[in-house]
């Protein structure tokens, strides 16, 4: 039975705009129990408002990865509140199809610290010793 969630929220439609898929948010080792708002319904999960900014204080064992604002090609802020939190969609040219991919595992993924890179999450999933449950959805962001 899955006990931890991990996800990436990315923008493949940013590739023609900036030359790479924009990472908006990545999270690892979030205990599913921490999101349950109805303990009588194991599928009733909720993410509270401003979750990304509140997460370090609310659930310290959960780690957030760097978003694309951390890219050395952008010269943006080194502030963890900017580069290691949710970075909301702002399609600059047209509507974009964003992709949310979620994985569920029985155990937390080892070796991931605050500010991990997305490839480290993918390696940790592949090397976890289990086949994670996974699902994804495309979400449209309006220009």
Which residues fall in each region the model found?
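N-terminus-centered regions that define maturation/targeting leaders and the start
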Residues: 1-143
